[in-house]
Amino acid sequence: AIVNGSYEPQYGGGICQAATTIYNAGLRANMEIVERLPHQYASTYVPVGLDATIDYGNIDLKMKNTSAYAMYMATYMYDNNGDGYPELMVEIYGEKPTAYDEIVPIAWCVENTGSKYSTYSARVYFKNGKEIKRERVWRSTYDYHGESAYQLAIPDDIENGPKDVQPTNKAPVHYG
């Protein structure tokens, strides 16, 4: 947990990693992000700009299914890479869209003042392996906390982000 600007072990301190995983699954499932706040500092377990923080009774993550069909979210833990440490997996099941095959969430730095920096996040939609559109999702602001120049590099196209985004060809969202 981040307490008064410092990392501190606490009960519930890892709950934001679960919220971040659910948030990214929601982005990939094309859910409307109703409420989401970033951390004070960028998280180390997800690209800058793609985190979500929660604090019971104060800060929440809220997403909305705007499709015409029900969605089902399954969460589970398993040792995906054999290192003995389980990872949180989130799968969202729903009706298969026809307009796109995959959504890849991205984020990039848009402003760096030295003490704070801001990012944009977006969904990149793919159909048959080709990018068909981008949709800006959120602007996040973080306190600088030792991030590298690479993490905070500002792309040539500040409004639309990096150009070299590729589909993952993975199925984080299940249809049927």
Predicted regions and their residues:
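Well-ordered beta-sheet/strand-loop patches within structured domains
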Residues: A1-G176
